[in-house]
UniProtKB/Swiss-Prot annotation:
One of its GO terms (cellular component) is cytosol. GO terms for molecular function: 16S rRNA (adenine(1518)-N(6)/adenine(1519)-N(6))-dimethyltransferase activity; RNA binding. It comes from the Bacteria. This is Ribosomal RNA small subunit methyltransferase A. Coiled coil: none annotated. It is found in: Cytoplasm. InterPro entries: KsgA/Erm, rRNA_Ade_diMease-like_C, rRNA_Ade_Mease_Trfase_CS, rRNA_Ade_methylase_Trfase_N, rRNA_adenine_dimethylase, SAM-dependent_MTases_sf. Specifically dimethylates two adjacent adenosines (A1518 and A1519) in the loop of a conserved hairpin near the 3'-end of 16S rRNA in the 30S particle. May play a critical role in biogenesis of 30S subunits. It catalyses: adenosine(1518)/adenosine(1519) in 16S rRNA + 4 S-adenosyl-L-methionine = N(6)-dimethyladenosine(1518)/N(6)-dimethyladenosine(1519) in 16S rRNA + 4 S-adenosyl-L-homocysteine + 4 H(+).
Amino acid sequence: MAALDGLPPLRDVIQRHGLDAKKALGQNFLLDLNLTQKIARTAGPLEDVTVIEVGPGPGGLTRAILALGARKVVAIERDPRCLPALAEISAHYPGRLDVVEGDALKVDFERLAEGPVRIIANLPYNVGTQLLVNWLLPERWPPFWQSMTLMIQREVGLRIVAGADDDHYGRLGVLCGWRTKARLAFDVPPQAFTPPPKVTSTVVHLEPIDNPIPCAVSALEKVTQAAFGQRRKMLRQSLKSIGGEALLGKAGIDPQRRAETLTVEEFCRLANCLLGEKVPRSGAAPLRTGFPSEDR
C-alpha cells in the first residue's frame, strides 16, 4: 500500500517522529498496511462517506480509508506526538482529512460530520468499550452512524455478538443485540501490532437496526445492570433492588431463571414493565453506571 498512496512505510513514520506507543493511552500501532486495508474494506464501499476514526496514531488505518475513496476522514487523536504524522497524510490528501485533538470520550460525535457517516477505528483498549456503549445509547434512533467497524479485544468482540445462554452474554450483548446486527469479521494476532498486546484482537462490524424493540434506554440499563451485576443468582434475587418477583410477574418471566438465559426481547419486556408501572422497591443503594468487566 505504500506504493498505492506514495507515503513512507509506517515503521519509518514511527521512527522519524519518535512514536513509541504509550500504555497509558491504550496505544498499540498497526504496522501492516495490507491489514489496515482489510479492516477498511470490512466497512463496505466508502465513496461519498465521511468516516470518523478514533485514535489514528501514526495513521495506518487513516491512509487505508482515504486510499479506498472515503470522501473525508475526521480523526480524533489525544496524543499530540501523532499530529505531525497525521499532518503529512492531510497534505497528501488535501481537504479530505480533519484531525481533532482531544479526548474521544468528551467529543460530540453527531456534530463532527455531515452526510453518511461510518465509524472505523482501532479503538484504544482502555476506552473502547465505553465509546461503543456511548454510540449505542442515544435516545434518538436510528443513530448518526450507518455502521461501525471496530478493532477491539477479542474478549469484548465475543461479548458484543453473544446471545442468551452464551458464556460471554452480558449487558453489552443485550445492548448490541437490541439495537444492532453485529458480526465478527476476523481476528488480528498480537504480532501485527507494535508493541504486541497480550491478547488477540478482533474486527467487529455493527449496523443499526432501524426499528428495534420499543424500550427506554434508561430502563433497559437499570434492568441489565441489576441482572448481570449478580449474574449467578436467580432473577428474583438479582432484581430485588428494582422490584424482584413483582416486576418479573408483570413481565411474565420465571423468577427462578438467571440473567444469562433471558433473550433481548425479555429484557426489553422487563424494562417496559419497570418504566410503565410502579413496582415495589427494596430501598437498595442506587445503581452504578458504566460497564465494569465483571458485569460483562
